[in-house]
Amino acid sequence: MNAEHAPFRHYLDLADARLGSQVVAVSDEWFAPASRMLQAGEPVWKEGVFDDSGKWMDGWETRRKRFEGHDQAVIRLGVPGVLKGVDIDTRFFTGNHPPAASLDGCFCAEGDPDDSTSWSEVLAAVGLQGDSHHYHPIDDERPWTHLRLNIYPDGGIARLRLYGVPYRDWSNQPPGTALDLAAAVNGGRALACSDQHFGRMGNLLNPGRAINMGDGWETGRRRTPGHDWVIVALGHPGSIEAAVVDTLHFKGNYPESCSIQAAFVEGGNEARIEAQSLFWRELLPAQKLEMHQEHRFERHLNALGPITHVRLNIFPDGGVSRLRLFGRPQLP
């Protein structure tokens, strides 16, 4: 499966280290640490760079196995989630990639798995090629807190992407508590945008403030009439009380202004949501933006009641590092 036929890539990468995901157990990491698999950036090749263990590689690499068995790494997800698809990425590993890999999962209410933990198969063993993406859809609605990557028998993996939806038990949410309903860790998801030439739309919902311009959403320079936009599905329906539009790191390329439309969408097809969004109500009228600054809007918001989706419009183009939508979840 190639990238064009892997629609699950639009989901959040639950293995992203920026979410707090980390490797908690590993059988071997002689040549390169398993933590590199979880880095958000794309893997790179450094010609002629060696360290004390050998050739420097941007990923996880184990030593050559001289006995029975296989290598594995256990990842604790920063937020529990339901997987929609995975990418086992072996870019730059040629001659030292594993010929096969599989994934297991478990749900630990507390702590990390131990010898008594029961694991379930998430992805049966699949063949791997060197220097390649390996996309596989996952059809399983069970949430996981930990994933175990098995490689057979040894070798190197550049990146492990675990695309899915964060799992949250909203029934345990204290009444009246305001949350960032757009946050990726709360299930918020960027669905569509007019352009993401320089920075992916999903970055808007990442935790914390952006580390650089690349950690935000940025469009190409608009040379035709119109403006850019992005549509976000909230993690849970709710009434918005405050909106934050952050242009941190965007200085000569920030939007002149922005507005937000919103709606309570019931059913329908996500593929049609772009056209539907043209007629959504105005949550935030057009507001002027400044460079490299966090803009918080409260009194400017219109009281629309519970909503499920928003459309952030930026005029005419540019970059925004974060979008925050604080509100009270509409609980049963």
Swiss-Prot record:
Pfam families: Allantoicase. InterPro entries: Allantoicase (IPR005164), Allantoicase_dom (IPR015908), Galactose-bd-like_sf (IPR008979). Its EC number is 3.5.3.4. It comes from the Bacteria. GO terms for molecular function: allantoicase activity. The keyword Hydrolase applies. Pathway: Nitrogen metabolism; (S)-allantoin degradation; (S)-ureidoglycolate from allantoate (aminidohydrolase route): step 1/1. Keywords: Hydrolase, Purine metabolism. It is an enzyme of class 3 (hydrolase). Gene3D superfamilies: Galactose-binding domain-like. This is Probable allantoicase. It comes from Pseudomonas aeruginosa (strain LESB58).
